[in-house]
């Protein structure tokens, strides 16, 4: 995970993340690829398939609502509201300065 986080940070800051990403790929016996955000997202899917990180990755890459919100949105509803969980009611009651996340009541 640390190597893929490093590769992502390098890519997002305009540097080449190929070395870090390909250390992970080569360890698994896979051929090297150029590091792009798309290839990195695919690599995270392969590496963390059963660890429950896909939703977080898709949210971070701005793709979650495109991949999983396939229903018809209600008029006036933001289809991307599912990227945030609602703030629990008891937390809202404890801190009156907090406002519920968009899309939740």
Task: Report the location of each language-model feature.
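Short, contiguous acidic/charged loop-to-helix segments that flank catalytic cores in large enzymes
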Residues: 9, 30-31
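Long, intrinsically disordered, low-complexity segments
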Residues: 25, 32-105
């Amino acid at each position: 995970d640390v190597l893929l986080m490093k590769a992502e940070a390098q890519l997002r800051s305009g540097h080449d993340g190929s070395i870090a990403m390909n250390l992970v790929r080569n360890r698994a016996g896979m051929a090297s690829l150029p590091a792009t955000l798309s290839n990195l997202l695919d690599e995270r899917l392969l590496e963390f398939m059963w660890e429950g990180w896909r939703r977080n990755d898709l949210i971070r890459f701005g793709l979650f609502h495109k991949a999983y919100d396939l229903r018809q949105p209600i008029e006036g509803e933001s289809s991307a509201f599912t990227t945030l969980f609602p703030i629990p009611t008891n937390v809202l009651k404890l801190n009156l300065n907090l406002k519920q996340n968009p899309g939740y009541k």
